Amino acid sequence: MASARGAGSEWSGSGLDKALRAGISQLRQRYLWASRHTGPAPPPPPPHPLPLHSLPVEVQLHILSLLSPRDLCQLGSVNGYWNAVVRDPLLWRYFLQRDLPLWKSVDYLSLPDTALLSKSLTQNAEQDYMAAYLRSCPESRKQWKSSHPVYSSVTSFLYSLVSQAEPRLAMFGPGLEQLDTSLVTKMMNSPRLLPLAGLPQRQIDGIGSGISFFFNREHKFNILTLYSTTWKERECARMEESAAINKLFVPQGVADVDGGDGDPPRLGASYSVIPQVEQVCRLVDGFIYVANAEARRKHDRKEECLQIQAMINRALGPAGRPLLVLACVSQPDMNRVPCVHLSHHLQLSLLDVPWLTQDSDAETLAGFLEGIEWIFRELGRL
């Protein structure tokens, strides 16, 4: 599974475990040398060490690398020695490299800094890899969410006093058009997962009314799907695996674009949206961006980044509306770009809105409801 999800990723590969473990002794020696010259030494082992204590530090780290992060945190509570050992930055950097491609979602509060893994350990001497891992991993985020139910209940109650209208979401992006399996068609034909709630009467010129669905058979929400061009042009581009001309956006000049992944900044066209889409942006409560996450294709992420920024422009509506990014592939077993890498490529950390990147596939709609639930929570509806 790891090799499948990590294909196309610079932080993954079938030889990752072997490479890290083969070099752990050399890296550990360098780190210990730096520690002796820059800070206090870790506390000595207990006076009557168990067999595990008598092993070389490199062997201890190798054994610890086989444990789960939860087990490590529990081991750190045994005594001062193990508390220091389980905080070893090399160990937690290894966990980040190993587990990050497998995470199915990441949000604006948990995205790890790309510099954590792109720079050497000595360059990141001040970084707390353990804290970065525990902040980013889905299990920790789930525990944090479950520990704040009162706030969610209060905001949901207050919102119900103000408005009863179903939330409206604008959905756009290349994943709607480039995949061999149509996400929208699957949504329309999955009544057990997404029951249809009808077509609203509120029309938007040139766009229509969108389609309403039930979430958990209780909460209604409306999706306005924004395609880049006509069906014929989209199909032609999909068959040729090329990008169709996007007629939702109008070039406005040039803007500095962060190169990402260590590349230097470059000049790129900035965009505005056409009048019909501008009307949509003023009315919706949030956005769904469907990214093509198939690793086999080439993607112009910098262009996508500029288009996302144009769509969520604060001048077109209330600030802070949530953005759900669906990292979508056609089939569940396809090689995909991990959601953390996709978030970095789209430069989502530069946005001033709450966002979530969620793995999904068009065939089974896996992850779609989790993303909708997140939007409802951000809007105070749950």
Where are these regions (language model features)?
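Switch I (effector-binding) loop of TRAFAC-class P-loop GTPase G-domains
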Residues: 188-238
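Inter-motif core of Ras-like GTPase G domains
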Residues: 240-264, 270-295
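Short hydrophobic alpha-helical "box" of cullin-RING ligase substrate receptors
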Residues: 51-68, 72-86, 92, 96
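Eukaryotic intrinsically disordered and solvent-exposed regulatory patches
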Residues: 47-50, 68-69, 144, 154-159, ...
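Conserved GTP-binding G-domain of TRAFAC-class P-loop NTPases and closely related GTPase folds
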Residues: 283-382
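Charged, amphipathic alpha-helical linker segments immediately N-terminal to NTP-binding catalytic cores
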Residues: 95-145
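CRL adaptor-proximal regions
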Residues: 1-54, 99, 107, 112
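Conserved G1/Walker A P-loop phosphate-binding module
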Residues: 142, 152-197
